[in-house]
Amino acid sequence: MLYFSLFWAARPLQRCGQLVRMAIRAQHSNAAQTQTGEANRGWTGQESLSDSDPEMWELLQREKDRQCRGLELIASENFCSRAALEALGSCLNNKYSEGYPGKRYYGGAEVVDEIELLCQRRALEAFDLDPAQWGVNVQPYSGSPANLAVYTALLQPHDRIMGLDLPDGGHLTHGYMSDVKRISATSIFFESMPYKLNPKTGLIDYNQLALTARLFRPRLIIAGTSAYARLIDYARMREVCDEVKAHLLADMAHISGLVAAKVIPSPFKHADIVTTTTHKTLRGARSGLIFYRKGVKAVDPKTGREIPYTFEDRINFAVFPSLQGGPHNHAIAAVAVALKQACTPMFREYSLQVLKNARAMADALLERGYSLVSGGTDNHLVLVDLRPKGLDGARAERVLELVSITANKNTCPGDRSAITPGGLRLGAPALTSRQFREDDFRRVVDFIDEGVNIGLEVKSKTAKLQDFKSFLLKDSETSQRLANLRQRVEQFARAFPMPGFDEH
């Protein structure tokens, strides 16, 4: 019986990491000698990772090779530039700096003050924001802490919020809870009510959202998604917020790069607060940003007195000291690098290509008879509903993983199981960073379709998900088909360049 092995030792090594692997073998063969040498000399801190920890170095090589030979379709992933990675792996990791520029609790912060202020300026410039009307906090460690900081700043415990339901394409931090448990910290500390998609169109049901808001009276409504392929009507959501006197938070984590490039509408005209991650379509290091309105909010018609926004101090206090300690200065620097890149014509071209590639992928899937939630895409992703095909996202994800295509299972409207949801989420940003074009994505869909068909055949022969996964590895004919498909996928993928470092 032929077993379909996924172990690294069974994989041929090509391109990414070949020379380094040779060095690793030499290091392993001389491990005893190296250890003896290390014992005889003092630690300098200048030892390379490959010298001081060959085991970890090899794991990095394996991951680098996986990325080079695979097709990365997870919509929330991208490939960071070498320049940003250099900042991320710099001496800035050494500096602790609780507080804000000019108001630190530690000395020696004059340089990191400049770095943080530079990141703030670039963040405002990237989204064409007037610093008199908008401010930004660049210290959140990622998107989820950024959202929690906003809730902490604007709400009291048990205040009410509304966000898109997770099975309909929302995010955990927008208040998700199941029938039996409050899943997200947002739903634990606050009272949440989801809004949903129209089941017929797959679009956000703004009319129902408005009706629900009138009854629920939320203090905060979140305009943001994690698996929604269409544009958000921020103006409509602003109307709802004004009617019920709620704040509007736009979570643009998935689409911030597209917003910066001006290829899709911006939420800043309508939102009170905007949060984002920095590693998705923005293509930076993993971190978070919180933008907030400042300046004059309104003028009292009776007294003529200017009424200012009060977000700045509340948000800054929520980030530090309420929720975080010292900022990750290395990440802030790397984000600043990415924000500079986001202001270039080249980044706009990249973002336009992301949209073209996503649409090409959607069209190719539709041509092959696949059902897409909402029927297509206006942004960087598509959500495939596999239920009409007779398959689920968990089985499709596993088959594709075995042939070096990385995607993720995802709930579709009406799904009741997060373990075997009906959807498969596919994104264009990462492969577009590897210079894929429309025809390349049509080829990718060919590979996906072949994998799904294998999955359908195996599903007809197995019962439970675990049986399905076991059959993929142990059935000789299936293993051979998967191995053949994987070889073609990897040969195709390796022909494209990879951003970042060559070796890791």
UniProtKB/Swiss-Prot annotation:
User: Impact of mutating residue 186 to R?
Assistant: In NEDCASB; uncertain significance
- Extract the PROSITE patterns matched here: SHMT
N6-acetyllysine modification, residue list: 103, 181, 196, 297, 356, 464, 469, 474
Highest taxon in the source lineage: Eukaryota
Location of N6-succinyllysine modifications: 280
Q: Where in the cell is it found?
A: Mitochondrion; Mitochondrion matrix, Mitochondrion nucleoid; Mitochondrion inner membrane; Cytoplasm
Q: Its pathway? A: One-carbon metabolism; tetrahydrofolate interconversion
Q: What is the effect of changing residue 98 to L?
A: Abolishes serine hydroxymethyltransferase activity, leading to oxidative phosphorylation deficiency
**Phosphoserine modification, residue list:** 470
Q: Which GO terms describe its biological process?
A: formate biosynthetic process; glycine biosynthetic process from serine; glycine metabolic process; L-serine biosynthetic process; L-serine metabolic process; one-carbon metabolic process; positive regulation of cell population proliferation; protein homotetramerization
Positions of post-translational N6-(pyridoxal phosphate)lysine modification: 280
The UniProt GO MF terms for this protein read: amino acid binding; chromatin binding; glycine hydroxymethyltransferase activity; identical protein binding; L-allo-threonine aldolase activity; pyridoxal phosphate binding
Q: What effect is documented for mutating residue 469 to R/E? A: Does not affect succinylation level or hydroxymethyltransferase activity
Q: Which EC class is this protein assigned? A: transferase
The protein's matches in Pfam families, at most eight in alphabetical order, are given as: SHMT
* PTM info: Succinylation at Lys-280 inhibits the hydroxymethyltransferase activity. Desuccinylation by SIRT5 restores the activity, leading to promote cell proliferation.
Q: What is its EC number?
A: 2.1.2.1
Q: Does the keyword RNA-binding apply?
A: no
Describe the function of this protein.
Catalyzes the cleavage of serine to glycine accompanied with the production of 5,10-methylenetetrahydrofolate, an essential intermediate for purine biosynthesis. Serine provides the major source of folate one-carbon in cells by catalyzing the transfer of one carbon from serine to tetrahydrofolate. Contributes to the de novo mitochondrial thymidylate biosynthesis pathway via its role in glycine and tetrahydrofolate metabolism: thymidylate biosynthesis is required to prevent uracil accumulation in mtDNA.
Query: NCBIfam families per the record?
Result: PRK00011.1
Family annotation (HAMAP family): SHMT
Extra information = In eukaryotes there are two forms of the enzymes: a cytosolic one and a mitochondrial one.
Q: How does it assemble?
A: Homotetramer; in the presence of bound pyridoxal 5'-phosphate. Homodimer; in the absence of bound pyridoxal 5'-phosphate. Pyridoxal 5'-phosphate binding mediates an important conformation change that is required for tetramerization. Interacts with ABRAXAS2; the interaction is direct. Identified in a complex with ABRAXAS2 and the other subunits of the BRISC complex, at least composed of the ABRAXAS2, BRCC3/BRCC36, BABAM2 and BABAM1/NBA1. Identified in a complex with ABRAXAS2 and IFNAR1. Interacts with KIRREL3.
- Disease (UniProt): Neurodevelopmental disorder with cardiomyopathy, spasticity, and brain abnormalities: An autosomal recessive neurodevelopmental disorder characterized by global developmental delay, moderate to severe intellectual disability, spastic paraparesis, ataxia, and/or peripheral neuropathy. Patients also exhibit dysmorphic features and congenital microcephaly. Most affected individuals develop progressive hypertrophic cardiomyopathy in childhood or have cardiac developmental anomalies.
Q: Which family does it belong to?
A: Belongs to the SHMT family.
Q: What is this protein called?
A: Serine hydroxymethyltransferase, mitochondrial
What is the scientific name of the source organism? Answer: Homo sapiens (Human)
* Gene of this entry: SHMT2
